């Protein structure tokens, strides 16, 4: 139980200073009030039952312990809700009458004891009400002189004892005080040095902070510049990436086209290879055809006229290309299957070929002589056939080396065109010319010259003589005249063209 054991406080009641002492012992409250000016004393003792009954009568019940705490708070002025007041009996009666609302009547005569009694009023203020707890204090009179003298003596003794103790310990106290002061001075000096060092560090930090701020500003500017450059580079990179994406798409499209072209060329190569194999396997020397009859000559003349009409309708570029490729060799029947193999040397065939070349040279000289002198009765027809035939037909079959050289030169020119242009159009033209050349080689031998149709009604002797003159003039060579040299030249040309085509395909593979 937290109760004040003893408390003495100077308190001013109505402008007069009083000393108030409170003592709580168990369930008993002791109060004593003394006037500082007159030394009059008022004292009272109250038990717990009296206090609780008093609070019950006021209408706001308080327990004894709570009442003691309220009294202590009023003396120490620690709470604004409780205050103290000291009233006489007359003041108390007027307060009671004012509270009850009655008129102040004539006061009855009072005794001297009531006039000397004082009432300590504990005022408890709540939000809308004020409650007064009166504590009566009987008058005790002035203090006894004998008691006062005893108190004075005891106080003097205590004072002397304390002074003696002070005299003995004065020097020690001063020395201790000086020592403490010196320690304090040294401590303050060390604190001063620490503060000076801290101030120097603060100044250095301030200077460093200023430099750091300047450096930070410079770095911020650098970062802003780098961010601007980064944005520009990103935009440029996006544009470059877009252009490269377009290039990639274009190149992918070109690659697809090249692959498609490669596939078509491979298919064409496969077709040509198969045709070559068939050509090598199916080569046979056809039997000697009998002289054409009247109906055959009529049909051949019609075919020649139709072929001349189709040839005139073709484009000049393709006609010139075919003319350059076909110049130097006339159309001839397919060679025998033994032409692709390496033949052994035959002296009889060599002698016959040499004699045949000499006869052809003599025929050419005779033709030149007839052309120069105007010729005989059939001279105009022969000269007309020489004019209508291409220059290669006039040279006859005896210039096989020249034809092989022409073929090799055409293959070399095709290779140079493929390597320089790197396009597929030349290859397609080459394949077309190759197919046309193959068809011409595999086709029937050309019909007699156009003017042979006018001799349809001539006797067989004249027709045979006419065929011999055509053979001598280079217009048409019989199948027997198609020797192994011509077959070897055709095979060499086909092999050279296939080799050039294979090289072109390899270059396409390396590019892709």
Swiss-Prot record:
Question: Which residues does this entry mark as bearing Phosphoserine?
Answer: 334, 336, 373, 376, 447, 473
Residues that the record marks as modified (Phosphothreonine) are 285
Q: What does the record list as coiled-coil region(s)?
A: 178-205, 248-275
- Its Gene Ontology biological processes? cell projection organization; centriole assembly; mitotic spindle assembly
Keyword match Acetylation: yes
Q: Which GO terms describe its molecular function?
A: identical protein binding; microtubule binding
According to the UniProt entry, which residue ranges have a biased composition of type Low complexity? Answer: 407-425
Residues annotated as carrying N-acetylmethionine in the record are 1
- Which domain of life does the protein's organism represent? Eukaryota
> Main location per UniProt?
cytoplasm
Annotated keywords? Acetylation, Cell projection, Cilium biogenesis/degradation, Coiled coil, Cytoplasm, Cytoskeleton, Phosphoprotein
| Region described as Disordered: spans on this chain | 276-477
Please list the residue ranges that the record marks as compositionally biased, kind Basic and acidic residues: 293-306
Keyword Acetylation part of the UniProt annotation? yes
Gene Ontology annotations for the cellular component aspect, listed alphabetically: centriolar satellite; centriolar subdistal appendage; centrosome; ciliary basal body; cytoplasm; microtubule organizing center
UniProt xrefs under PANTHER family: CENTROSOMAL PROTEIN CCDC61, YEAST SPT2-RELATED
* Family (UniProt): Belongs to the CCDC61 family.
Its biological purpose: Microtubule-binding centrosomal protein required for centriole cohesion, independently of the centrosome-associated protein/CEP250 and rootletin/CROCC linker. In interphase, required for anchoring microtubule at the mother centriole subdistal appendages and for centrosome positioning. During mitosis, may be involved in spindle assembly and chromatin alignment by regulating the organization of spindle microtubules into a symmetrical structure. Has been proposed to play a role in CEP170 recruitment to centrosomes. However, this function could not be confirmed.
- Description of its domains: The coiled-coil domains are involved in microtubule-binding.
The record's note on quaternary structure and interaction partners says: Forms homodimers (via head domain). Interacts with CEP170. Interacts with PCM1 and CEP131. Binds tubulin.
Q: What is this protein called?
A: Centrosomal protein CCDC61
Q: Which gene encodes it?
A: CCDC61
